């Protein structure tokens, strides 16, 4: 979950408070939807990015899911991976200095080496995702640069960094799936970031669970 402290009990209490105050779904329901292959929304704290991301576990990220993210999320479509898997793929960090405000750990962008055309279509991006998350994937299976943007989740998950990257990996693990996922920030029609009231409306409109 995104909302955390280093003490598990305090973290659970804070999450319960947010769920009660804002009508968010219990994290257990979000995990159940994730396991079933449904998309969901994760929001972070107002003191952090104050944004919501469309999320889906990697194995369920088909062309329809990618198209939904591109059409309705409008943000950057990213693939959250563990450090071990990015090393298996031989992916280098986009910039080792990483001076971004929230230390978002981008690697170089990627494309499936085989089976894609220009790489940007929903089907091509879904193929790239599935190629990259294959447990036997190697550097030879991936070309760079490309149209999917991998993110490296911190070891230790949301107990170490309260980011969407770590949250989707934690949820995938909790759902009994491989620890990866696809995320995309949600923007409004006017190009500004969707905040919690907007995200609640968005979730209701598209029948999605929303968690913290």
Labelled PLM ranges:
Residues 15-211:
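Catalytic domains of riboflavin
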